[in-house]
Swiss-Prot record:
Signal sequence residues: none
Keyword entries, A-Z: Isomerase, NAD
Pfam families hit by this protein: adh_short_C2
Catalytic activity: (S)-8-oxocitronellyl enol = cis-trans-nepetalactol
Organism (species): Nepeta racemosa
Protein name (record): (+)-cis,trans-nepetalactol synthase NEPS2
Amino acid sequence: MGNKKTLEGKVAIVTGGASGIGETAARVFANLGARAVVIADIQSELGREVAESIGAKRCSYVQCDIGDEEQVKSMVEWTATTYGALDVMFCNAGIMSKAESAQTVLELDMSKFDEVMRVNTRGTSACVKQAARKMVELGTKGGAIVCTSSPLASRGGYIDTDYVMSKHAVMGLVRSASMQLGAHGIRVNSVSPMAVLTPLTRRMGLATPADVENAFGRFTSLKGVALTAEHVAEAAAFLASDEAAFITGHDLMVDGGLLCLPFFAPTS
């Protein structure tokens, strides 16, 4: 994104900021001039390490399970009290099912379904709600909320029904919140990345960038470019910045043209 400080002076929260896309976003936000970045995550050791590497004056870690709204409320309140502002909320934390099955409709493990919904749907909703309430209370000018969604929110899936459903719910939240919060000058958007190497994809057995490319590259029309966490973080930073001042209710696809291609059935 170059050296332009598009987030100069802003106070931002990044949920799931201890690893993966969230960690990269925390670093990108800081590099783009954010006055403070708060990492909210359940991974305390990793969260503290990331915050320390960015710098104590620029970044803090707060332990927060976003599925617990009281923890989200406390984290948002701590941020506003500590830094005197809240300009950006990047609702990035999310999980995939840990079920032994593929979570097809016929095999749906409802206890694992509930775990996914607790984080991806309830947790994201709590983050949007509490951030928006604080922005309204503070009279934040140009407040921005960005959620991590998925290209699957525009399609169905052969597996991982609970994850697909959760991302459809996130898109409903983004569209509704953008309509309701526009009167307060708060923009709400989402970023939908194709699969990228993160701890989440490693748990799927994809341990290297080459593994991810081999698994998903055939589904993109854009060739010769491998998606990185930096690409996703920079897309989120754009939506969070004043350069996107008239953009709200939008889902920014970072999918290499996935949705431009005909639909492919699985080969096995």
